[in-house]
């Protein structure tokens, strides 16, 4: 794996920013660190990039304990970069290349990847927020690192800028980059990431493949006036859960397994006639809420 995190803990006085957080990031993944503001996402990335020191725990990058030489192989965007607004995009990248000790001939390549090559001579003051963020990602790509670390890369952007950055991240993934990114946006993780770790108040709630952690459970919504309706619903096999929504009962099933005909037949065989049956999906927001409410 590209990154192994083992029992990281960090406190700020009485506040526990991270508590025994462990996970691994496989090569080629877009790994989302998902959580609301204050969940510990930025603290975690700052520890990984050696900006902060953990109270306890350890991590390895590219199979080695984090060190200066390893971090030179990683492109990082943890906050708004310090670009010079009176210089052009290309001139700003020349400064970044010198700091990173990268060949300036790489600038043309990263500008094209970021989609701002045609504005390379324009002063940064004329760039939109989305273009500035793409320039920041272009700076991360100097030297062609295999691993990229982004902290909320679409934060503060308009819908067009968000779409541009997400498309760029997907393109970088397709080119074989491993990307570790923090986000508080559930739909962003679903659309962009292959793997996810969910943080809440410094605790790791779940980690794994996005399709496994953020599954869209099937819901069969049913109703009957029969006196045994609830008893039969509770005995329904293969369901993963049951809840009430007003006059209806909602039966939860693993994604892709709900079968209205099978449910209807089961109730009929038990002597209960359903007056209403409908298959829906549990929203991703509901799933996320359930995970975070376990704390």
Place the predicted regions along the sequence by residue.
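C-terminal coupling/interaction segments
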Residues: 255-295
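ABC-family P-loop ATPase nucleotide-binding domain
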Residues: 1-9, 294-295
């Amino acid at each position: 794996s590209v990154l192994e995190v083992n029992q990281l803990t960090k406190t700020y006085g009485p506040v526990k920013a991270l508590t025994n957080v462990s996970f691994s990031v496989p090569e080629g993944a877009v790994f989302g660190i998902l959580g609301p503001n204050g969940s510990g996402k930025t603290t975690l990335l700052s520890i990984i990039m050696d900006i902060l020191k953990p109270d306890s725990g350890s991590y390895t990058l590219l199979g080695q304990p984090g060190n200066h030489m390893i971090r030179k192989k990683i492109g990082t965007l943890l906050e708004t970069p310090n670009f010079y607004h009176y210089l052009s995009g290309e001139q700003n990248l020349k400064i970044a290349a010198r700091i990173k000790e990268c060949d300036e001939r790489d600038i043309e390549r990263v500008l094209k990847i970021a989609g701002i090559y045609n504005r390379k001579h324009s002063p940064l003051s004329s760039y939109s927020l989305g273009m500035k963020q793409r320039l920041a990602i272009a700076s991360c790509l100097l030297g062609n690192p295999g691993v990229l670390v982004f902290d909320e890369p679409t934060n503060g952007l308009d819908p067009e800028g968000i779409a541009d950055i997400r498309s760029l991240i997907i393109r970088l993934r397709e080119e074989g980059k491993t990307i570790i990114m923090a986000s508080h946006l559930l739909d962003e993780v679903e659309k962009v990431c292959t793997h996810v770790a969910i943080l809440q108040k410094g605790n790791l709630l779940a980690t794994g493949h996005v399709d496994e952690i953020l599954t869209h459970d099937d819901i069969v919504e049913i109703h009957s006036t029969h006196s045994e309706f609830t008893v039969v619903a509770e005995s329904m096999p293969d369901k993963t859960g049951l809840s009430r929504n007003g006059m209806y009962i909602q039966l939860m099933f693993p994604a892709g397994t709900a079968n209205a005909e099978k449910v209807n037949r089961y109730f009929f065989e038990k002597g209960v006639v359903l007056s209403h049956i409908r298959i829906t999906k549990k929203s991703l927001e509901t799933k996320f809420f359930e995970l975070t409410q376990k704390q």
